Amino acid sequence: MLDAFSKVITSADGKAAYVGGADLQALKKFVSDGNKRMDAVNAIVSNASCIVSDAVSGMVCENPALIAPNGGVYSNRKMAACLRDAEIILRYVSYSLLSGDSSVLEDRCLNGLKETYASLGVPAAGNARAVAIMKATVNGFINNTAQQKKLSTPAGDCSALASEAGGYFDKVSSALA
């Protein structure tokens, strides 16, 4: 996993150059937005169980066949696995948002995800829908538009962070497609 600083240093070192110019400005912006970034991650982490359960519930409500016999999440064991997997995805998205880099998500979560689900007979469409619901919910928490929130969320314009988080969820959706 490379954070924003490691990426810039690795790039500059590869060119045998000093860190400067646009790279330095990008790091300054990353640092100045650090509190917003941490508040956004805190909003996700503090509401993780609700985000995950709402996403899985929404997926099931839209496709009740999933909980019918032989459905993708029929049985307590399969439902528990579904909730666990959604929680893992959300956790790695939060890691990526905190570090400003998607490599931890790609390396530790998405690598082989589609093949694993296919081998287990888990329907990809349902997973993709749960990810889309999580993306929308996280967007609401980061942009401070979530209804009935319990905790304060990031102050100021956080649209860039919401867009960044959305990009991480898009990577998950692409990996499942």
Curated annotation (Swiss-Prot):
GO terms for biological process: photosynthesis. (2R,3E)-phycocyanobilin 1 binds at Y18. It is a peripheral membrane protein. Light-harvesting photosynthetic bile pigment-protein from the phycobiliprotein complex. Gene3D superfamilies: Phycocyanins (1.10.490.20). (2R,3E)-phycocyanobilin 3 binds at R77, C82, R84, D85. The gene is cpeB. SUPFAM superfamilies: Globin-like. It comes from Hemiselmis virescens. Its main location: plastid. Heterotetramer of 2 identical alpha chains and 2 identical beta chains which form 2 alpha-beta heterodimers within the heterotetramer. The two alpha-beta heterodimers are rotated to an open configuration in contrast to the closed configuration found in other cryptophyte species due to the insertion of a single amino acid, 'Asp-65', in a conserved region of the alpha chain. In the open form, the central chromophores are not in physical contact but are separated by a water-filled channel. Belongs to the phycobiliprotein family. Contains three phycocyanobilin chromophores and one 15,16-dihydrobiliverdin chromophore with binding of the phycocyanobilin chromophores mediated by both the alpha and beta subunits. This is Phycoerythrin beta subunit. The light-harvesting system in Cryptophytes contains phycobiliprotein complexes. Unusually they are composed of either phycoerythrin (CPE) or phycocyanin (CPC) but never allophycocyanin (APC), with only one type of biliprotein being present in any one species. Unlike cyanobacteria or red algae these proteins are not arranged into higher-order phycobilisome complexes, and they are found in the thylakoid lumen. (2R,3E)-phycocyanobilin 2 binds at K28, N35, D39, P154, G156, C158. It is found in: Plastid, Chloroplast thylakoid membrane. InterPro entries: Globin-like_sf, Phycobilisome_asu/bsu, Phycobilisome_asu/bsu_sf. One of its GO terms (cellular component) is chloroplast thylakoid membrane. It holds the Pfam family Phycobilisome.
